[in-house]
Amino acid sequence: MSKQPQQSLTLRSPAKLNLFLHIVGQRPDGYHLLQSVFQLIDWTDTVHLKRIPENEVRRINPIPDVSPEQDLVVRAAKLVKDFCKIDLGVEIDLKKEIPMGAGLGGGSSDAASTLIGLNTLWNLDLDKKTLSNLGLKLGADVPFFIFGQNAFVEGIGEQIQEISLENRDFLVIFPNRAIPTVSIFHDPELTRDHAPITIDGFLASPLSNQINDCQAVAMRICPEVKQALDWVSQALPGSAPRMSGSGSSVFAVLDPKTDSVKLENLLQSLPKGWIGRVVRGLNKNPAYNLISSD
């Protein structure tokens, strides 16, 4: 008797933090060349995929004001469907927990989970390299989530090397203001000539003197970024908070001795509308075991 195909699959999509973000150049086509360390964290969305008999991609509970053309999980499903030239259907239900426009990579992670999940659900047998190449068409951060491990990332996001990081806790604050990435990278005052560093250079001092080249521009465009940085600095003196990605979320590495009750009280005292969470670093994407490297 032949094995019945799997009918549904649920994946957790982790957010990420940029422990630093340097812009080291710009290509003739306008794309910026970056260096960063991407840290996976346990702030997750949930992607549920279900086979349907119709030959279509169906999204239930869509995000308000996000069209199917902009919806990364829909685009990811259609992309892999077209690439493999298959007549199969899927219903996608996305439960959002990671704030949108926060610099935490939630949309890219959801797209990666959709590609990984459909590769399993539809028995496509695509390897990690193929999935990553498809993911890059959706966004520069998608290949990292398909790679599935903490990484030193270069180029436009496609050069990814595994990096070993200690398990740490972080305080992450989102001041509830999305910053369009394009507004950061098109700004004439953005630093574009940061001297490149090496993995060893980062590991020699992973917690101190790490900066985000997008932060100064983001603070000018979005005053809430500076407000959030100041709030964390006052709440946790000496924590050296910085922005993640192109903003507007900021984060600080927590001292293991920080009292949990103090942290809970801090989160209760956040300015109205802000979102805060204490998160734990992850070593791997929860979907890592579904990804074939062959």
Swiss-Prot record:
ATP binds at P99, M100, G101, A102, G103, L104, G105, G106, G107, S108, S109. It comes from the Bacteria. Its EC number is 2.7.1.148. Keywords: ATP-binding, Isoprene biosynthesis, Kinase, Nucleotide-binding, Transferase. The active site is at K16, D141. Transmembrane segments: none annotated. InterPro entries: GHMP_kinase_C_dom (IPR013750), GHMP_kinase_C_sf (IPR036554), GHMP_kinase_N_dom (IPR006204), IspE (IPR004424), Ribosomal_Su5_D2-typ_SF (IPR020568), Ribsml_uS5_D2-typ_fold_subgr (IPR014721). It catalyses: 4-CDP-2-C-methyl-D-erythritol + ATP = 4-CDP-2-C-methyl-D-erythritol 2-phosphate + ADP + H(+). One of its GO terms (molecular function) is ATP binding. Belongs to the GHMP kinase family. IspE subfamily. PANTHER family: 4-DIPHOSPHOCYTIDYL-2-C-METHYL-D-ERYTHRITOL KINASE, CHLOROPLASTIC. Catalyzes the phosphorylation of the position 2 hydroxy group of 4-diphosphocytidyl-2C-methyl-D-erythritol. This is 4-diphosphocytidyl-2-C-methyl-D-erythritol kinase. It comes from Polynucleobacter asymbioticus (strain DSM 18221 / CIP 109841 / QLW-P1DMWA-1) (Polynucleobacter necessarius subsp. asymbioticus). The gene is ispE.
